[in-house]
Each structure stands twice: as structure tokens, then as C-alpha cells.
């Protein structure tokens, strides 16, 4: 039998196969993964087919929003979490990863005919857009709008199926304009999204040494003050109107980095140079999902 090397990993001994036997074991595991992937692919396609049949059986001819049922989505997620709890100790994924995967699966199935249109307070790359994707998945069509008023108006007029608006920040308090808008709007609250505000340093450079200036919204700069002082004490700090505008500058200007959420890195094709640089990890923003009916 091939020799095995002992290594320590987080307090426990792990045996690592060496030589040809080790390479064969890795190939065998990869083959098993490939078979699981094929099964997953077939099951995902079967789920999509069944989801489409549900729509047809309901007489789906009109608006897709009528076939998005938040209560059914909650039931699917609850069952997924129950199964995950039962699988503890057997290599189970974390609950938040399970929720994210199932939301993306449901989003893709729902979008087979036409994606849901979700209005949010823009511009693109903001935390509001991150909240859209967290709740509806990346298959939803996120519509960047200029103001909270416009989000309400687009949903009221039927140009967007749902809207996502900020309602409360754990450090800044309530968003009064959102609260005021409910006084005159017929829209209803259809759901809630709690988003941990993770600030990331991003840019096109390969190392922090290449950074000449850092742009971000004043709140984000303030939330990362200590990290910036420790790691980039000599760079210029520039306040921008939004984190998205800062990310755009980081994309277009050599030597410029931005502080923003992960979605901004995706939208503006930036590399995350350092993740989770906020001084307080407990900062969250709560968003409401608004629609014409529950």
C-alpha cells in the first residue's frame, strides 16, 4: 500500500496519499464528482420542466408576476434548510449557501418565459441591487431607478413587477422617505431583505502598492476609516455621490481604487483587492419588497 503523509489541519490529523496511488485516488474522486454533476444537471432540467408545467396548468397566458408566489418560495427554502439541518456532520453546506443556491435555481426556473422586472434605487452596483439579487436571484431583471419615488411609481404603473427599497440601517436608522411614501401608495409589502453591508476594496491593479487614490461614498469611507488608516495611510481619499460612481472611476482611471459592495465589482469588472474591510461587521441594511399585491 502506498505511503501516506500525516499533516495537521485545524487540530486534526489528515492523511494525504502520495505517489501514483494518490493520483489515482484524486482521479477517482473527480470521476465521482463528474457523475454527480451530470445527475445535478439532469435534475435541474427536470425541475425547470416541472416549474413550466405548473405555469401551464394554471393557465399561464398573461403576466408572469401572477405566478411568482413568495409564500411558495418561503416553503421551498424552509424545507431546504430542514434537510440541511438533518445532514449536519455529513459535509453539508452552510445554511446561507443553501438559501443562495435554491434562490438562484428558483429564479432561473421562473425566468424561463420572461424574467421578473425588479425596480431598485440605483445606480447599478449599489447595495440595493445586491438586495435584489439576494431575494430574487440573478435571473431577475434589475431596473436601476433614480429615486425611491421612481421605484414606487414604476411598480404602481406596472412597469416593474416588484420594487426593492431601503427601510432601515442598523447604524443610520430609518429611511424616512420610504416610510413617507407608503402613506400615499396603494402598494403592499411583499417581503423583506436583510443585507449585511460588506465593504470591499476593488480596482484593476494587482497590489495595494499601485493605489494612488480611493473613491467611495462618504458613509463607506467612514465605515472603513480604521482599515484605510492601517493599510493605505498615504493615499488620497475622494468622496463620490455613490459607491457605483466610485467603481466606475476605478474601472476608468489608472491608480484609482473604490470601496463598494461585491455587486459593483461584477458590474464594473473589477478585482476585489481586499474583502470585508469595514471596521464594524455588524452593519446591516433592511430592505422591503413592494408590489401591487401580496
Locate each region found by the language model:
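Domain-level signature for soluble enzymes in the chorismate/prephenate branch of the shikimate pathway
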Residues: 2-294
Amino acid at each position: 500500500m502506498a505511503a501516506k503523509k500525516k499533516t495537521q489541519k485545524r487540530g486534526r490529523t489528515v492523511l494525504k496519499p502520495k505517489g501514483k496511488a494518490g493520483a489515482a485516488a484524486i482521479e477517482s474522486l473527480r470521476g465521482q464528482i463528474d457523475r454527480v454533476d451530470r445527475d445535478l444537471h439532469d435534475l435541474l432540467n427536470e425541475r425547470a420542466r416541472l416549474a413550466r408545467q405548473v405555469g401551464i396548468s394554471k393557465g399561464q397566458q398573461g403576466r408572469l408576476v401572477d405566478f411568482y408566489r413568495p409564500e411558495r418560495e418561503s416553503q421551498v427554502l424552509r424545507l431546504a434548510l430542514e434537510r440541511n439541518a438533518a445532514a449536519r456532520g455529513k459535509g453539508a453546506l452552510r445554511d446561507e449557501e443553501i438559501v443562495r443556491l435554491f434562490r438562484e435555481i428558483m429564479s432561473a426556473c421562473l425566468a424561463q418565459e420572461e424574467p421578473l422586472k425588479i425596480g431598485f434605487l440605483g445606480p447599478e452596483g449599489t447595495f440595493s441591487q445586491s438586495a435584489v439579487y439576494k431575494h430574487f436571484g440573478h435571473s431577475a431583471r434589475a431596473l436601476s431607478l433614480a429615486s425611491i419615488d421612481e421605484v414606487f411609481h414604476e411598480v404602481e404603473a406596472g412597469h416593474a413587477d416588484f420594487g426593492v427599497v431601503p427601510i432601515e440601517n442598523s447604524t443610520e436608522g430609518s429611511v424616512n422617505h420610504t416610510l413617507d411614501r407608503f402613506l400615499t401608495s396603494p402598494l403592499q409589502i411583499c417581503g423583506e431583505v436583510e443585507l449585511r453591508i460588506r465593504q470591499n476594496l476593488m480596482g484593476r491593479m494587482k497590489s495595494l502598492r499601485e493605489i494612488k487614490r480611493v473613491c467611495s461614498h462618504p458613509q463607506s469611507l467612514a465605515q472603513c476609516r480604521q482599515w484605510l488608516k492601517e493599510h493605505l495611510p498615504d493615499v488620497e481619499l475622494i468622496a463620490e455621490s455613490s459607491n457605483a460612481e466610485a467603481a466606475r472611476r476605478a474601472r476608468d482611471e489608472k491608480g484609482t481604487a473604490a470601496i463598494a459592495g461585491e455587486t459593483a465589482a461584477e458590474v464594473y469588472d473589477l478585482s476585489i483587492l481586499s474583502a470585508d474591510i469595514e471596521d464594524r461587521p455588524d452593519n446591516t441594511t433592511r430592505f422591503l419588497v413592494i408590489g401591487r399585491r401580496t
